[in-house]
Amino acid sequence: APEVGFVTATGIVAGNLPLALGAALSSKGRGESDVAVAFFGDGAAQTGLFHECLNLASLWQLPVVLVCENNGFAEFSPLSAHTVVERLADHADTYGIPTETIDGNDLTLVRPAAAVAIDRARNGAGPSFLECLTHRMRGHYEGDPTLKRGTAERDEAKDPIQRFARFLDDAT
């Protein structure tokens, strides 16, 4: 629904990144203040397309926020089998993109980090990279054999919605 700012979605790993950069380039070229935001998983951060997009986003100072949902697994494989970096945000650092790694399950941290990144992009300061550390509440897909993953992984205490509800309850 482009009329509400949603351009597209794709099932291709990292395929939404160049689409977000295209939207950001279009906004910048028209002199508009729109900001593109792309959400992707840690598996996408292991693709060549990811690095090409980081390079161009930085080179062209595009108004884009790249949000990596890092749950530590690329489909079935632990992240340690795919990369040597401790933080996936380190990749963006290499391209001169400001980064922040946060607890992606804590909405009180996500919202202000996103606001800073969006303001940067909207004010012409270029891209930002947010690495949101999280966990899987469900399998990678409906038939995922890892649905039997340990209870610590599925702990409802980590659920961001329930966690924020507790935060609101405690604040009243």
Please describe what each predicted stretch is.
Residues A1-W60, P78-V84, A89-G96:
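Cofactor-binding active-site loop characterized by glycine-rich and histidine/acidic residues
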Residues V4, F40-Q46, C68-A74, N105-T108, ...:
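Acidic, glycine-rich active-site loops and adjacent beta-strand->loop/helix elements
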Residues K28-E32, V84-V116, E156-T172:
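Conserved thiamine diphosphate
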Residues V35-F40, V65-V67, F129-E131:
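Structural motif
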Residues F50-C53, P112-D119:
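Glycine-rich, charged/polar anion/phosphate-binding loops
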Residues S58-C68:
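A glycine-rich helix N-cap at a beta->alpha junction
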Residues G72-S77, I97-I102, D144-R154:
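Short beta-alpha connecting loops at secondary-structure transitions
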Residues R120-T172:
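Glycine/aspartate-rich loop-and-adjacent alpha/beta segment that forms the canonical ThDP
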